[in-house]
Design a protein with these regions (language model features):
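Charged, amphipathic alpha-helical linker segments immediately N-terminal to NTP-binding catalytic cores
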Residues: 1-33
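Long, non-membrane, amphipathic alpha-helices that form coiled-coils
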Residues: 27, 31-35, 366-375
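Globular "head" domains of long coiled-coil molecular machines
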Residues: 39-337, 348-370
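Flexible glycine/proline-enriched surface loops and loop-helix/loop-strand junctions
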Residues: 340-345
Length: 375
């Protein structure tokens, strides 16, 4: 493509030189303007070919753990997570060795806006939390209030450790899209337009058992796909919170039955409403995942002993069933007294049982397969 672009520039230059000799003076400025515009467009095309940007956009159904997925991709808890819907505004995370946060000035902003460099993970989390909670609490009484828009630069794990085989000079960014309740809010529509060529990871709440709510979730999936535009072929569906089935006496049969039914239902619902993508939907990639235990696995391996012990405590309290056999083998209950060997055993078990490795591998393959379209 780069060769053809340069060839086109050469052809146009020859054509311009030839035709200019036969046109009156009044046409010369118009021809020159066309030349300048073509040169700018070709330079931009060549620059983007040499410096491609890979965008991963995250979206999901209600209470699907989308924000935890973003934190998993980053390898740190920097995006606010809550039981209720927290993703009120779009957050762009660009890869950099330096950490920074920008919260942009938006119409009527009631939260602190500005730029912070060399900021800690905890401070990023707190500032985003304050901006989002302020917006959520005031949006009904102030309908013209624009949602918060922010950009983080961060050395996220996705690029550092997941062994993505990307061309040199490829820039990578993660786009954490607003929750379904805020998709239509002022400011978010422009961000969603950026996802037309992105690889979209759609999280689905596997823990929901109510049949009416499941039907509602399927409708949400269809709506998300429609809002994002583009082909479902570039979407990766994650059946999140899949660990709930491990409590069943009939596991793994119950998990397998759920996965088969969920894939069938998602494909049927999408095919019914997006008939033009029938072939892409048939080849849809759906993976199992439990984002929180996978994230805890990474946090446990952190070299900061206090941070690591806190992650161990959360794993013990919330995911006892995943690590029961290891916990029974440990000499002490107090997580602060666990040895590095103890912590590594717990981390490995969480990573395996959360399907963290399978998710990472599928994501890597999906990016490699669709890379030309994604950039």
């Amino acid at each position: 493509i780069e060769f053809k672009a340069k060839l086109l520039a050469q052809y146009w230059d020859n054509f311009q030189t030839e035709i200019s000799q036969h046109l009156p003076e009044s046409y010369q400025s118009e021809i020159q303007e066309l030349s300048n515009n073509l040169e700018k467009a070709l330079n931009q095309l060549i620059y983007e070919l040499q410096n491609p940007t890979l965008t991963l956009a995250t979206t999901g159904t209600t209470s699907s753990g989308k924000s935890t997925l973003v934190n998993l991709l980053c390898g740190a808890e920097i995006v606010p997570v809550a039981v209720s819907e927290m993703s009120a505004g779009a957050v762009t995370i660009e890869y950099s060795t330096e950490k920074s946060l920008i919260i942009y000035e938006t119409p009527g902003a009631l939260w602190e806006c500005g730029e912070w460099r060399g900021i800690s993970d905890d401070k990023i989390y707190q500032r985003l939390y304050q901006a989002m909670i302020s917006y959520i609490e005031n949006r009904e009484t102030q309908p013209n209030l624009a949602c918060p828009q922010s950009t983080i630069t961060y050395p996220f794990r996705l690029l550092k450790e997941s062994q993505l085989q990307l061309p040199k000079a490829t820039r990578v960014r993660i786009l954490d899209l607003p929750g379904l309740a805020y998709v239509g809010d002022q400011g978010n529509a422009n961000v969603i337009k950026q996802c037309r060529e992105a690889l979209c990871i759609v999280t689905y709440n596997s823990a929901e058992t109510d049949s009416q709510k499941v039907k509602s979730l399927l409708q949400e999936v269809v709506q998300q796909v429609k809002d994002l535009g583009g082909s479902p072929a570039r979407m990766l569906f994650a059946l999140n919170r899949i660990d709930v089935f491990r409590a069943d006496r009939s596991w793994p049969e119950s998990e397998n039955r759920f996965v088969e039914k969920a894939i069938r239902d998602i494909k049927n619902e999408l095919t019914e409403q997006l008939k033009e993508y029938t072939e892409d939907i048939e080849n849809l990639k759906v993976v199992k995942l439990s984002t929180w235990p996978a994230l805890l696995s990474l946090q446990i391996q952190n070299q900061d002993d206090i941070y690591s012990a806190d992650a161990c405590k959360k794993a013990r309290n919330h995911f006892y069933g995943l690590i029961e056999d290891i916990l029974e083998d440990l000499p002490v209950v107090n997580t602060q007294k666990w040895t590095r060997h103890d912590k590594n055993r717990v981390a490995q078990a969480l990573w395996q049982k959360s399907y963290g490795e399978e998710f990472q591998q599928n994501l890597r393959e999906h990016i490699n397969k669709h890379f030309p379209q994604l950039v």
